[in-house]
């Protein structure tokens, strides 16, 4: 049962990124002109806490939830990150919805960490302006707009 390995995947030019929903795992792959796929880097923000039973993977209660939203351009990768204990979602689904936005260089270095006022699952990077758009649905759905430079300057 590999449903625990679900997450978000986006591409930008010849690179694609994967961010795990249930673990703090983020990676980048590049695709060559010959269509060879090469792992460029991978990061694990925190070690997963799980049990492995033959072909099954089960998260333990003290495992921290991972990434929900993912977007990238030619310089940066942005993700919404939960970091909450996964068991909280069993009691209240929205308890693990991210309140942190992380920015990484395309080389995988953390370059910004921003505390969000509202829980936000989805993130989109504008193609035309240096802005990020986040969707939050706490009481009703709203789109919040952030300047990319503000996120990159932020350090929690």
Which sequence ranges carry the predicted segments?
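Surface-exposed loop and turn segments in beta-propeller and other repeat-based domains
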Residues: 1-3, 38-62, 117-118
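Structural signature of eukaryotic scaffold interfaces centered on beta-propeller domains
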Residues: 2-13, 17-19, 62-73, 124-128
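A detector of repeated loop/turn-to-beta-strand junctions in beta-rich toroidal repeat architectures
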Residues: 23, 96-98, 140
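Short loop/turn segments immediately following beta-strands, especially the blade-tip
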Residues: 29-43, 111, 146-156
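Short, conserved, GDST-rich strand-edge loop motifs in beta-rich repeat architectures
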Residues: 79-96, 142-146
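Blade-level signature of beta-propeller repeat domains, shared across WD40, Kelch, NHL, RCC1
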Residues: 124-156
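Beta-propeller blade signature
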Residues: 92-110, 147-152
